[in-house]
């Protein structure tokens, strides 16, 4: 069985962009938990949070994670998926977790360039740069503790994918005596 790959990291780190390209490169299926959830409940994340609160959204997010997990799949997760211990445990036990790490300034620049940035409800009520810094400070340790692989996601997607592939191959050689792909 080819294990699923779970991409974790903050908003703007490239989980969806890198995930789609990685899935193509590895000939795997791609799914984004936020997109899957929104399509299945016919509501945006903002609508879910407004109606059910963050706790309701997080519960739906956990269910989405389990629903989309399948062999030979690259899963782009929501930035806060690691907040729930059950999600961290689930990902570690059911696949390989890859943390796409990037500094605050890179994340803010990417988010400001996205037209849908205003569609996501604020977590702190602060400016984008303050919120990104605060949220990353709180979550970075959880991303790092959960990840099997940590990749510098400040580079172009092609470089990030090359690094992921090399690290997956190293991991496979250490664990199995063979290549991942």
Curated annotation (Swiss-Prot):
Entry's free-text remark on domains: The LID domain closes over the active site upon ATP binding.
Catalysed reactions, as listed in the record: shikimate + ATP = 3-phosphoshikimate + ADP + H(+)
Gene that produces this protein: aroL
Source lineage: Bacteria, Pseudomonadati, Pseudomonadota, Gammaproteobacteria, Enterobacterales
Alphabetical keyword list: Amino-acid biosynthesis, Aromatic amino acid biosynthesis, ATP-binding, Cytoplasm, Kinase, Magnesium, Metal-binding, Nucleotide-binding, Transferase
A GO CC annotation given for this chain: cytosol
Involved pathway(s): Metabolic intermediate biosynthesis; chorismate biosynthesis; chorismate from D-erythrose 4-phosphate and phosphoenolpyruvate: step 5/7
Membership in a protein family: Belongs to the shikimate kinase family. AroL subfamily.
Protein name: Shikimate kinase 2
Organism whose genome encodes this protein: Escherichia fergusonii (strain ATCC 35469 / DSM 13698 / CCUG 18766 / IAM 14443 / JCM 21226 / LMG 7866 / NBRC 102419 / NCTC 12128 / CDC 0568-73)
């Amino acid at each position: 069985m080819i294990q699923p790959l779970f991409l974790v990291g903050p908003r703007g780190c490239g989980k969806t962009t890198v995930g789609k390209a990685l899935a193509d490169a590895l000939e795997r299926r791609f799914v984004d938990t936020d997109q899957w959830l929104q399509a299945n409940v016919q509501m945006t994340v903002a609508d879910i949070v407004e109606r059910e609160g963050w706790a309701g959204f997080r519960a739906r997010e956990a269910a989405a994670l389990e629903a989309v997990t399948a062999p030979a799949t690259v899963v782009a997760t929501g930035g806060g998926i690691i907040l729930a211990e059950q999600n961290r445990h689930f990902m570690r036990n059911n696949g390989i977790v890859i943390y796409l790490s990037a500094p605050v300034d890179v994340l803010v620049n990417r988010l400001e360039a996205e037209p849908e940035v205003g569609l996501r409800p604020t977590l702190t009520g602060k400016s984008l740069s303050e919120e990104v810094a605060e949220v990353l400070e709180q979550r970075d340790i959880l991303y790092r503790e959960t990840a099997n692989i940590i990749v510098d996601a400040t580079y172009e997607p092609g470089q990030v994918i090359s690094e992921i592939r090399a690290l997956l191959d190293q991991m496979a050689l250490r664990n199995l005596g063979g290549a991942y792909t």
